[in-house]
Amino acid sequence: MIDSLTTLMIYFFLPVSYLLVGFVIMYYTREAFKKHMLENMVSPMWQNYVFVMILLIWPFFLFLVVTTTILKLFKAVVN
């Protein structure tokens, strides 16, 4: 059975760490991202909005993939 420390790690520390890593990566690549990607796809009025939405959403997808993999590994180890 998965103990409480592992549960805390999976549901608290992993999402927080992925969000922090995501924010740091997006912070340091924001100018290149805005210039090369958003300039060609989105009108200038919406660029900041789209950038913030991507900044907030993509770490959650990364978190879901990694957490699901970890949970499957724990389940395989436990069984």
From Swiss-Prot:
Membrane topology note: Multi-pass membrane protein
Membrane in keyword set: yes
Subcellular location: Host membrane
GO cellular component, one term: membrane
Span of the signal peptide: none
Keywords in alphabetical order: Host membrane, Membrane, Transmembrane, Transmembrane helix
Keyword Membrane: yes
Bilayer-spanning residue ranges: 8-28, 50-70
Primary subcellular site in the record, as a coarse category: host cell
Protein name per its UniProtKB record: Putative transmembrane protein ORF17
Organism: His1 virus (isolate Australia/Victoria)
